[in-house]
């Protein structure tokens, strides 16, 4: 994508709903934790005379976003880093609070649509899958890891119940160097047929990508940052695309809004002892038929939003653990 093409409108999923939740105000400061092609940042900047600090660990996104920085002179700052490090950068800028944050979790359309990045099962390319284009690649991991470690990744992050079978097939097929090679091995190991409804390669690719990029750990850290920096009534809006991410976000928002629930519906609710940092979460929002017709990738998207309460942030306060849920026991 060239700098000129980057200026062309890019509409991320649930854009109207995200902007409605954020409700940008004049003079506000907003964080776009996952800049990508700049769709959310652009919409925030167009909605009101605001400032946006946008983060992306992918150097391609930062480089190609330079045209937006030029267009919105002095109002958009791009940072080549993970959104888990937002706090470090805000501290360096001496910014104490912000008016809103948006996180669009997972791989971007830009990354999927470029075969050379190795994220897609639809086009052949090198086994890469690194968002930051640094660190361990998918090729290095799959060709060197123990079979058990590969199986664990597929099971935990792809919820693949036949993960051991797939891992055995991957080890037997080494060396693997391309996305088509890997997809073929996965499909053959699970007896996939072209007319089957779901392609098992999709969630196995997802699992490997999540592992390599530490996506769930990054998500947990980013959510904690929002608690610290959002001002009273500031919005945290998070868009997720699969159940692992969504469960983490849902649990975080409920627990930090004081909704710890109860062990059984027949037992009384235990009074909440921890401070309440967020309002009661709104109902999750999903794409309507009009958006789905325009962008089929929005089908799995879920938006959750909460608003910061007046409770002061303190490092000394004990907080609920935003755990990564484990799936049921796998079969061989």
Swiss-Prot record:
- In which broad location class does this protein mainly occur, judging by the first location in its UniProt entry? cytoplasm
GO (cellular component) term, any one: cytoplasm
Keywords (alphabetical) are: Cytoplasm, Methyltransferase, rRNA processing, S-adenosyl-L-methionine, Transferase
**InterPro entries, alphabetized:** RsmH, SAM-dep_MeTrfase_MraW_recog, SAM-dependent_MTases_sf
Q: What is its EC number?
A: 2.1.1.199
Cell compartment(s), UniProt: Cytoplasm
**What is this protein called in UniProt?**
Ribosomal RNA small subunit methyltransferase H
Give the source species.
Answer: Zymomonas mobilis subsp. mobilis (strain ATCC 31821 / ZM4 / CP4)
What gene does this protein come from?
rsmH
